[in-house]
């Protein structure tokens, strides 16, 4: 690929040709985000395949997601839609109130309360929810393990996970692993929500993400701006995608062939979450992509990505694969948008939109087409 950009013609701006070095540099930043999302979704799909009984639809797990309406198979489509929208509205209202409460606690410097709450929640997720899943898996796979060993494992896993995730310093890879486990555990329980409520909730969360991140009065935007003003870390469940220490060095060495002088000023890498503006220090000379060496992604994004793919896995491998690739493609588009525009971007809308369209397209069009081809002995290679 040429390093020359064609001159502007007919009043049009010159076309930027992405070089191989630029492509490799962008891939080095994006892949550390794609890998953990892939692992989280794959684990959720594995749990669904192991524990879900085909043909048996859960009537709901209770709680906030079914506070208004409990879906029944005998209900009409209009009743299911109205009930699902009511459930989604209640859930979004709860999330909005909780986020504003988080903002007020952070504003008045009560971060210790936030950390204490998250630590307690993490302990419950690892110990109770995770323990319940573990017992179900052992029972389903008919694996005999004595209860003392199970309790000792759960004690170490839950207490160690809560401390390493929220309080103790430790290896980044360990914290990343525990965060992936949190997203897997929570997302599996969300897959037990009734179907209509699930899809309505996913769409509602994508719309809420747009409001919370992009609007001036959005709660997430207000929290990020306050954190930037104080130069403090946000007390939240955030996955940091910083890769191995040599990744940034390898990327700089590769790109140094083209922009050695401009790279000199980038010795210090910047961390830029999807809900936070890009630092100007991460610019890469003439490159159109300005992704930093490290990106932070909210754990809620992991959870709802996994819920979508887990729900798709309940129907067929075709729908699951289509949704899986669509969600990852949407995430890559969002990350490229972050690099191109350097603005705060919500991570849910693009992936949820593509994943939802892929699910219904595969379920109602692609899968019947493939089954019909198979029934007639036609194979496309």
Regions flagged by a language model, labelled:
Residues 1-381:
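Multi-pass alpha-helical transmembrane bundle typical of ion/small-solute transporters
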């Amino acid at each position: 690929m040429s390093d020359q950009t064609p001159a502007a013609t007919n009043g049009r701006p010159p076309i930027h040709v992405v070089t191989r070095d630029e492509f490799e540099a962008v891939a080095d930043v994006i892949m550390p985000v794609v890998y953990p999302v892939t692992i989280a979704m794959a684990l959720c799909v594995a749990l669904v395949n192991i524990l879900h009984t085909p043909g048996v639809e859960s009537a709901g797990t209770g709680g906030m997601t079914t506070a208004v309406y409990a879906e029944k198979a005998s209900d009409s489509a209009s009743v299911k839609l109205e009930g699902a929208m009511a459930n989604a509205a209640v859930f979004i209202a709860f999330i909005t109130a909780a986020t504003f409460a988080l903002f007020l606690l952070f504003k008045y410097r009560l971060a210790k309360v936030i950390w204490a709450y998250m630590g307690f929640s993490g302990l419950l997720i690892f110990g109770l929810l995770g323990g319940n899943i573990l017992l179900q898996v052992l029972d389903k796979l008919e694996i005999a393990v004595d209860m003392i060993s199970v309790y000792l494992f759960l004690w170490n896993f839950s207490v160690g996970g809560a401390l390493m995730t929220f309080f103790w310093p430790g290896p980044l890879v360990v914290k990343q692993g525990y965060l992936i486990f949190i997203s897997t555990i929570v997302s599996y329980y969300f897959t037990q929500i009734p179907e209509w409520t699930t899809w309505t909730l996913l769409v509602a969360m994508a719309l809420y993400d747009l409001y919370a991140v992009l609007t001036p009065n959005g709660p997430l935007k207000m929290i990020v701006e306050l954190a930037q003003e104080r130069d403090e870390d946000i007390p939240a469940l955030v996955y940091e995608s910083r890769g191995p220490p040599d990744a940034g060095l390898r990327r700089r060495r590769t790109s140094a062939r083209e922009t050695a002088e401009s790279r000199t000023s980038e010795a210090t890498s910047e961390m830029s979450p999807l809900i936070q503006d890009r630092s100007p220090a991460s610019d890469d000379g003439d490159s159109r992509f300005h992704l930093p060496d490290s990106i932070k992604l909210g754990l809620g994004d992991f959870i709802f990505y996994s819920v979508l793919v887990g729900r798709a896995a309940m129907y067929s491998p075709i729908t699951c694969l289509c949704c899986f690739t669509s969600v990852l493609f949407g995430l890559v588009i969002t990350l490229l948008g972050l690099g191109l525009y350097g603005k705060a971007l919500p991570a849910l809308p693009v992936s949820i939109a593509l994943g939802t369209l892929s699910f219904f397209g595969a379920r109602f069009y692609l899968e019947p087409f493939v089954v019909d081809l198979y029934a007639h002995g036609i194979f496309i290679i």
